[in-house]
């Protein structure tokens, strides 16, 4: 019943897209979608875009995470490829390889047939669930958040999330946008292992990145932090709690950004990391 109530505010195309993507995540389509994501498309994107120019730091900080622990991966957001590459790095970890879900704004991917096709084929259905900008679809956003909470309470699941809530297009990639409370709510209510990360060096243009990978420049640097210790909250959590934790996650990501900045200056000439905002 709640499913139908939440979907009622969506257009016919959005309802179809949601059901297709849910099938790839919760129906019998989940297994082939997982094989496609982990075995084909994510490694292919990583190999095409960054394999020859990627530097990874801090991955050893994750060695103590239990094999089946649910993981919330929180990162900065400069390009469409951020979570793709970070997810690719994690699935290569001997104990952390699992399907990753990347919640996405509904624009294009849930509103057009081409967007749905690209989402299904190019991500293996991992861009699920969707979030909507319009106020009349607020119930759907609550429903999507509850789907993520359920995933993050399930052993072996991983969700990638941007506390900033939207892509940071400013000229300074090291100054994050204000954190939105959604990431804090997921962390507090589900209590997963929260892994912060920072990545920089890419644009939003696929072929530009393919060519850059062949040239091995500019460098793409990814830094992982140790799991975040979450505060204990007695009773029901409130919006103020969610925002406070989201701010904490942003602080952890920003600290990794400072680490990335120092590493970048040590391994390469001064570059223009702000290029990723374009």
Model regions and ranges:
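A transmembrane-helix-recognition feature enriched in membrane-embedded lipid enzymes
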Residues: 2-57, 85, 92, 113-125
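Helix-to-loop junction immediately C-terminal to a conserved catalytic motif
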Residues: 45-77
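Structured helix-beta-strand junction loops
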Residues: 50-51, 68, 124-125, 154-155, ...
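Catalytic core of membrane glycerolipid acyltransferases/transacylases, capturing the structured
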Residues: 65-137
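Residue-level signal for beta-strand positions within conserved beta-sheet cores that form or flank
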Residues: 52, 96-98, 218-220
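A generic local structural motif
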Residues: 41-42, 56-61, 89-90, 115, ...
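Non-catalytic C-terminal accessory region of glycerolipid acyltransferases
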Residues: 2-16, 20-24, 28, 138-278
């Amino acid at each position: 019943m709640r499913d139908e109530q939440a979907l009622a505010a969506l257009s016919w195309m959005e309802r179809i897209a949601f059901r297709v993507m849910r099938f790839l995540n919760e129906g019998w389509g989940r297994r082939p979608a997982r094989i496609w994501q982990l075995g084909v498309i994510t490694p292919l994107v990583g190999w095409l875009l960054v394999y020859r120019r990627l530097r990874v730091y801090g991955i050893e900080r994750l060695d103590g995470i239990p094999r089946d622990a649910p993981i919330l991966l929180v990162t900065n957001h400069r390009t469409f490829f951020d979570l793709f590459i970070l997810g690719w790095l994690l699935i290569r970890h001997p104990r952390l390889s699992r399907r990753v879900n990347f919640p996405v704004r509904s624009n294009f991917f849930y509103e057009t047939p081409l967007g749905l096709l690209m989402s299904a084929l190019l991500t293996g259905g991992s861009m699920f669930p969707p979030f909507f900008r319009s106020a009349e679809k607020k119930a759907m956003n609550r429903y999507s958040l509850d789907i993520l909470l359920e995933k993050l309470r399930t052993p072996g699941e991983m969700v990638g999330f941007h506390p900033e809530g939207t892509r940071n297009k400013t000229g300074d990639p090291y100054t994050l946008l204000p954190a939105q409370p959604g990431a804090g709510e997921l962390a507090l209510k589900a209590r997963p292992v929260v892994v912060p990360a920072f990545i920089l060096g890419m644009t939003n243009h696929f072929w530009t990145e393919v060519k850059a990978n062949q040239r091995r420049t500019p460098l793409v640097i990814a830094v992982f932090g140790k799991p975040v210790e979450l505060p204990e909250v007695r009773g029901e959590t409130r919006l103020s709690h969610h925002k406070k934790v989201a701010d904490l996650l942003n602080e952890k990501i920003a600290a990794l950004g400072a680490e990335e900045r120092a590493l970048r200056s040590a391994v390469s000439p001064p570059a223009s990391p702000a290029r990723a905002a374009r």
